[in-house]
Amino acid sequence: HHPSSAASDVYKRQILNDINEYLVFVSQVKNLSENTTKSYERDLKKLYLFLEKLNVTNYSDIKEEICSAWIGDLYSQNNKPKSIQRHLSSAKGFFRFLKKNNLISSSPFELVTAPKSSNTLPDVLSPEDVEQLLNFKPSNTIEIRDMAIVELMYSSGLRVSETVNINISDFEENMSFLRVIGKGSKTRLVPMGRFAINAINNWLNEREKISNNTDALFLNLKGSRLSVRSIQLRLKKMAIKQGLPPVHPHMLRHSFATHMLESSGDLRTIQELLGHSSLSTTQIYTKLDYQHLAKIYDKSHPRAKK
């Protein structure tokens, strides 16, 4: 359900208008050179086209994931890290300007970082990187657990805090959906890919050796719920062992969002999957929503392919 084209035209005019006002501001008030102003203009037009491609119709739709996806997009067009840094600072400046003028309440670009030099990866792994990360046979309890964690986080775009809080009772519909309690206690249902389901089943068998008197899905060897810190450390180790730079959990979520966006372009669905929309906990999902989510998911997620 995309907003009416009239509404999105108004938004397009507004964003172009805001960009122009910002350019006037930097050249006249901040007295920046014509060259700098021109490069801001080029960068912001690129951002505008990227947002247009995703059917973004509102500043409030621009979340951190979209900002990262844009950086990833610039990266994939072989822009040099220096140039990406500049694009990012243009965007940050523009959004700070919007915030100062009360057009937005907070800037989605604030926490987004660009690669410092050519040997650091952006915040998004390519599907091939994910493949490489997960390309090993787990040989002990911990590896079986870690495999399940990573497959699940990437499969469903979970935050690391959501991952540690999962209980076995949160699986629905013979394990094809997971009920996730996100920020602000908002509940959402996320589909799981085949790889994740297999990895979790392997872990559930293994988990019985450790404990069967707790509902927490992911445990340490002592039988208590795994901590966020443990997942961060294990993931970093796993990445290095697989010949990748250190990976942090949020990269899996960014990668999920980016890969889904790239292959489906369906921003609304992805916001729902990420738990960004204002779905209230009480909202009853209809079967139809499920089917739409599941359809987009199966078509778009690199590891959902049946």
Question: Where are the language model's segments positioned?
Answer:
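Single conserved hydrophobic/aromatic residue that forms the stacking wall/gate
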Residues: 1-11
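N-terminal core-binding DNA-recognition domain of tyrosine recombinases/integrases
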Residues: 12, 20-35, 41-121
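Basic, Lys/Arg- and aromatic-enriched nucleic-acid-binding interface segment
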Residues: 104, 132-160, 184-186
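DNA breakage-rejoining catalytic core of tyrosine-based enzymes
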Residues: 117-132, 184-195, 209-214, 228-230
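C-terminal catalytic core of tyrosine-transesterase DNA break-rejoin enzymes
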Residues: 151, 155, 229, 237, ...
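Conserved tyrosine-mediated DNA breakage-rejoining catalytic core shared by Y-recombinases
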Residues: 156, 161, 165-202
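Short, polar N-cap/turn motifs at the start of nucleic acid-interacting alpha helices
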Residues: 171-173, 227, 245-246, 265-286, ...
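Active-site/catalytic core of tyrosine-dependent DNA strand-transfer enzymes
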Residues: 194-244
